[in-house]
Design a protein with these regions (language model features):
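Short N-terminal helix-initiation segments at or just after the protein's N-terminus
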Residues: 3-7, 17-25, 53-61
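Hydrophobic residues in beta-strands and at strand termini
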Residues: 18-19, 64, 114-116
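A conserved, well-ordered hydrophobic junction motif at loop->secondary-structure transitions
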Residues: 21-36
Length: 146
């Protein structure tokens, strides 16, 4: 029997708004709140890729570049860029969008590694991602060394 390929390698895009309850005394978004949004997007991307449930096992090379403020829209993009037999590496980037311009300014990026599991919480095999472009090869290498 032939191994099934990935169901989708298209990115997942999540939009969220920074509300007062998501900010600190300086009205900037809590880093933990942003990490939660990014983790959720990574999980959706992994599930879209393999049609499986996933759990996060590590977050690597996460860099906070600039703050997001109360009222900003956060656009988070997650894409599977690396696989091993049971694990996906998802590159996640978050941008802040001001309401006046709706132009993205990167605020954070990193790699989220997730393991596919069955109903008993045991790891299961997944389809493999095969980089085809130079950009995909570069992201594969970055994820592998993260």
């Amino acid at each position: 029997m032939e191994e099934a390929g990935p169901f989708s390698i298209e990115p997942v895009i999540v939009l969220d708004e920074v509300f007062p309850g998501h900010t600190n005394a300086l009205n900037t978004l809590f880093g933990g709140r942003l990490m939660s949004i990014m983790d959720t997007a990574a999980g959706m991307s992994a599930s879209k890729f393999a049609h499986r449930e996933f759990v996060t096992v590590s977050v690597d090379a996460l860099k906070f570049r600039r703050p997001a403020f109360q009222g900003d829209i956060i656009r988070t993009t997650a894409r599977v860029v690396w696989t091993s037999p049971r694990t996906v590496g998802v590159h996640v980037t978050s941008c802040r969008l001001s309401r006046s311009e709706w132009i993205g300014e990167e605020i954070c990026s990193g790699f989220f590694f997730m393991v596919a599991i069955d109903d008993s919480m045991k790891p299961v095999e997944i389809p493999q991602f095969e980089p085809k472009s130079d950009e995909e090869e570069e992201m594969w290498s970055r994820a592998q060394s993260a």
